[in-house]
Amino acid sequence: MESFSSKSLVLQAEKKLLSKMAGRSVAHLFADETSSEVLDELYRVSKEYTRSRPQAQRVIKDLIKVAVKVAVLHRSGCFNPSELALATRFRQKLRQGAMTALSFGEVDFTFEAAVLASLLTECRDVLLELVERHLTPKSHGRIRHVFDHFSDAGLLTALYGPDYTQHLGKICGGLRKLLDEGKL
């Protein structure tokens, strides 16, 4: 017996379409103004740190693709109860990471790259477990790329150093607003 599911086909088409569209400009369609500003600032930090515009664009594009695909999966009700528990755990870890990043940015001499890198690695692992049966290995690679990039100790140390003060201030301001509004 052939199993046909229009819902599955629609979901595949949505994911395929969104994967072709994802870019910094598309982020503004799926994210609010504050989220877009944080993404733009993360792009600037990545570009400055790597000294590579294409590399910075790739990491932000991958971040957007993954975020949109996970949102589509969630909105479409594709997650079973254990996966919904993982989604909650991921959100809690991401929120904890944002609050830790804010604390490090607001309190002098408290920054520890290893702590932030560890939180980001935990987020990556939970997200990979969440989407394991839903996304392709290519998407799993995108998740690893994004989290490995932003958990790099060199990047984190530079971000919290004197040369990136303006970037860090804007990122922290955006994170604070997202946390206050309950969007993160």
UniProtKB/Swiss-Prot annotation:
Gene Ontology CC: cytoplasm; lysosome; nucleus
Coiled coil listed as a keyword: no
Highest rank taxon of the organism: Eukaryota
Keywords, alphabetical: Cytoplasm, Immunity, Innate immunity, Lysosome, Nucleus, Phosphoprotein, Ubl conjugation
Keyword field contains Cytoplasm: yes
Chain positions found as Phosphoserine: 3
Entry PTM: Phosphorylated by TAK1/MAP3K7; this phosphorylation triggers association with BTRC and subsequent ubiquitination and degradation.
Compartments, as annotated in UniProt: Cytoplasm; Nucleus; Lysosome
GO BP, one annotated term: innate immune response
InterPro entries for the chain: TNFAIP8-like (IPR008477), TNFAIP8_sf (IPR038355)
Protein family according to the UniProt entry: Belongs to the TNFAIP8 family. TNFAIP8L2 subfamily.
Subunit annotation: May interact with CASP8; however, such result is unclear since could not reproduce the interaction with CASP8. Interacts with RAC1.
Function, as annotated: Acts as a negative regulator of innate and adaptive immunity by maintaining immune homeostasis. Plays a regulatory role in the Toll-like signaling pathway by determining the strength of LPS-induced signaling and gene expression. Inhibits TCR-mediated T-cell activation and negatively regulate T-cell function to prevent hyperresponsiveness. Also inhibits autolysosome formation via negatively modulating MTOR activation by interacting with RAC1 and promoting the disassociation of the RAC1-MTOR complex.
Record comment regarding domains: The central region was initially thought to constitute a DED (death effector) domain. However, 3D-structure data reveal a previously uncharacterized fold that is different from the predicted fold of a DED (death effector) domain. It consists of a large, hydrophobic central cavity that is poised for cofactor binding.
Protein name: Tumor necrosis factor alpha-induced protein 8-like protein 2
